[in-house]
Amino acid sequence: MAEDVRAEIVASVLEVVVHEGDQIGEGDTLVLLESMKMEIPVLAEVAGTVTKVNVAEGDVIQAGHLIAVID
């Protein structure tokens, strides 16, 4: 079953670490966000394959924004 990864805060996307098709493990960093001059990693809560990456470096995203989908 697909797992949506969503932003918990308003932030800028500093770095996209994974790409569609990548195999990832639980706890792997998916993207690095920046908010209030702090770098915040977004970690995978499940292992699987990244089926969608919905952000790019430099994007400003809102809380609840879909970052990626893991299947």
Curated annotation (Swiss-Prot):
Domain of life according to the entry: Bacteria
The keyword Nucleus appears for this protein: no
Domain Biotinyl-binding: 2-71
InterPro entries: Biotin_Carboxyl_Carrier/Decarb, Biotin_lipoyl, Single_hybrid_motif
Pfam families (alphabetical): Biotin_lipoyl
Residues recorded with modification N6-biotinyllysine: 37
Keywords: Biotin
Gene3D superfamilies listed in its UniProt record: 2.40.50.100
Keyword Transmembrane helix found: no
CDD domains registered for this protein in UniProt: biotinyl_domain (cd06850)
NCBIfam families in UniProt: PRK05889.1
PANTHER family assigned to the protein according to its UniProt record, in alphabetical order: OXALOACETATE DECARBOXYLASE ALPHA CHAIN
Name of the protein in question: Biotinylated protein TB7.3 homolog
Native species: Mycolicibacterium smegmatis (strain ATCC 700084 / mc(2)155) (Mycobacterium smegmatis)
